[in-house]
């Protein structure tokens, strides 16, 4: 029987000023580029290359994914939501710096948030939010509520390794030169992450038809469409 390190939840919000600064300045280009590339190559998303579409990024953090998409798909209406006020300030500052503040809207929202428009978005995204949530069903149910019929869905997050030693190795491999606060956050996030089997069970329990697969040595991805 395969042994897996026990999950250790971490705080739902990562919004302390030192955490926000370290996270905003960190180099997540590789994983964010992977996320964007995977989305733009989804068959159900290819139809929107030159068509207007409404997209929401749940747990958008400092906004890098929203901004990358805004550059590549100028016809899209892009909204990022997050429950961290300081994180949203960082996202808004990044948008202004790139002269994208009129292209991307950032909004404070704590899921589940009934003020967000229901069945409104053609694309629903989330990257690295699930492991922060005490109840993972909050994300999967929010996706069902916010996405229009046939909406494309993509969720990516860390996968919990089998041991603390493996978590330490991943921190050294990918955050060796990062500030200590970011190293600790990464280690804590790996321990708080869900396994592939756990995510697949969550998706089934939510009644979603998403394909869940491992996509790197530390990430899984879930993709599909809403059929409600």
Please name every model-derived segment.
Residues 133-143:
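A short, conserved alpha-helix within the catalytic core of class I
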Residues 125:
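A conserved beta-strand element that flanks and buttresses the S-adenosyl-L-methionine
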Residues 56, 64-113:
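Class I SAM-dependent methyltransferase SAM/SAH-binding core
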Residues 156-207, 211-214, 221:
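C-terminal alpha-helical "lid/dimerization" subdomain adjacent to the S-adenosyl-L-methionine
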Residues 29-51:
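Conserved alpha-helix/loop element of class I SAM-dependent methyltransferases that forms part
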Residues 1-22:
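N-terminal, positively charged/glycine-rich alpha-helical extensions of SAM-dependent methyltransferases
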Residues 147-152:
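Short glycine-dipeptide loop
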Residues 51-61:
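Conserved class I S-adenosyl-L-methionine
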